[in-house]
A protein has these predicted regions:
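Src homology 3 (SH3)-mediated interaction modules
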Residues: 1-122
Length: 122
């Protein structure tokens, strides 16, 4: 998987369904950081809820050393989501099809994760 900060777009997509973001502030986890792992998400089974010193959020379990109890972050991860409206054209920067989300960039330059199921090829 590419770094989230990579400026090259993989492809262009269009939002077919609006995506609203959660009210929870984004969480950035760094390699080596310790987190407490909670429940697995029922809608997105690749994700587990984690609590870190700076907040909490949903993270793909593969970025952690364990999927329950206390774990160490093995891959840097940023939970920032990108809100979309129907018809928004987005550049895909990172494809994470295992989790069902894409890291996208809007025409205004904002970036974040968007669910694949809300997008279609352009």
């Amino acid at each position: 998987m590419r770094s989230v900060r990579d400026d090259r777009a993989v492809r262009t997509v269009v939002a077919k369904v609006a995506h609203d973001i959660s009210a929870r502030p984004p969480l950035r986890l760094d390699v080596g950081q310790q987190v407490d792992v909670g429940d697995r998400d029922t809608e997105w089974p690749e994700f587990v809820f984690v609590t870190a010193s700076q907040g909490s959020g949903w993270v793909p379990a593969r970025h952690l050393s364990a999927s329950s109890g206390t774990a160490v972050v093995v891959t840097t991860y940023d939970t920032t989501e990108l809100p979309t409206q129907v018809g928004d054209v987005l550049e895909v920067v990172v494809e994470d099809l295992t989790s069902g989300w894409l890291w996208c960039r809007s025409s205004e330059g904002r970036e974040g994760w968007v669910p694949v199921k809300t997008l279609e090829a352009r």
